[in-house]
């Protein structure tokens, strides 16, 4: 994912589909933190309710910008990234609960999903953009700051402590999905029963489309045919977003936390993954994790062991 979070920029377009009536189906479209979003309300609602929902959407994106956006130097996560080692920081309940979920995913994947890879990510991207690669010594030095086990969460005091001052958290692999979950919750809290939410390719639905069928999605990178999703989320990841060729090797933007190196594209590598789950946060994290396996077959086997519904594209499929 390319620079998922920058300064927030909101534009909401409301389309009154049945304009001759007092109640209408609504579509909200815009850009939040450089990423396009689309929200379709499948219920008939009046203008006043539509304006309230518009406000709530704005507030939800603002929460993500204020708390989870590591491109915002004043966000909570940025303050954590700037903190020195063994400094106990008080954080909001919202961020604490989110990081608990991140820790759960880290443990479930045995460290394959690790948001503390930011130091390595920055190292590799800076080198690849120059047409070079870092030395093994540089990679090993930066790896010392990587590992979510270097993060200590204190639930009683709602605090976080880093054991290494260079440890920095990159939430790009999970915060989009979490925001989509928050948007759906916001709509449900405002008595919306049927809706489609998409932000930067991460999708979640409730209820049905206005014509009465379940919502349909086309995961173009893995399936390229419509599938119905019934009140669940769908998230994708792939090596198609960024790549660099250096010394006859093609590298992607996805860093493997175990090796400390970006994934290389070859005839066996996983090219794209799509995951369906009731939580978009989880689908988002699992889609990224499944990219890390050496082949489509190994990725599928791990997904089956986790009971995941997936679509996985390999180099030969």
Could you tell me what each predicted segment is?
Residues 14-15:
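Short, linear, compositionally biased motifs with a strong N-terminal bias
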